[in-house]
């Protein structure tokens, strides 16, 4: 397919992706606020955190519509979205925000697993314990954000670089060039290793906590009803799928990315979808949460008149 066909496909895709993802995310946020189980406690904070960062991810993705020209050295980053009308440094900054938002939403799912395990163990949450766990799992993100700030300052904000991009984009209409990507600088290499390492490691860490949760609720020391155990199993199943989605989407497109860099092959799918595919979990995650968190699913059934209000079980029963 030619470049024009990819642009036509994305011209249709981005509005649908934005509208559908935003509606489902806002619906989920409403349910988190007003229909969460009483004992969900801080888990709903992490569900909300995941949803908010995925909204940012969707907004940035659709407003930027990046394309990576991997045949150029260094890699040329173009914007075909509304950001093309702004200065290049803003587009480059939004690219870093895109990565951070994806990183944060993925890490939030992992932290939800950790605190779910703590709840199953019936551990009391002290402020120091909560703060310690959150800081521990956010260390890679904090380090990544520091690297991204350094990259923006060094590679986008200097006056001579800004003037260079103003000249390049003076007559740009279809797209603007917003930056250059390379792994030859220390901050960019560190940032790449942090993000790619977390994408690979997070699903397996989540799976580790999944097994511990299931072993715990199936042990003789966990004195709760079969129904309650079943609800926890369903909740954990949904989290597991969410945890593995980034890995499923990232690995193929990143493999193609490295192939294009090493061989200098032009593959238009890779160029146009390199930043689209990693955003797709934001499309699927809210639907998974709406389905696998029982009170949310039942509330949706009530709205669709599939189930009557009187049939809804108390929302206090999901987590404890």
Swiss-Prot record:
InterPro entries: 7TM_GPCR_serpentine_rcpt_Srd, Nematode_rcpt-like_delta
Compartments where found: Membrane
Chief subcellular location: membrane
Membrane-related topology note: Multi-pass membrane protein
Keywords for this protein: Membrane, Transmembrane, Transmembrane helix
Signal peptide: none
Example of a GO cellular component annotation carried by this entry: membrane
Transmembrane segments: 12-32, 42-62, 95-115, 133-153, 189-209, 243-263, 273-293
Record Pfam families: 7TM_GPCR_Srd
Family the UniProt entry places it in: Belongs to the nematode receptor-like protein srd family.
Name of the protein in question: Serpentine receptor class delta-40
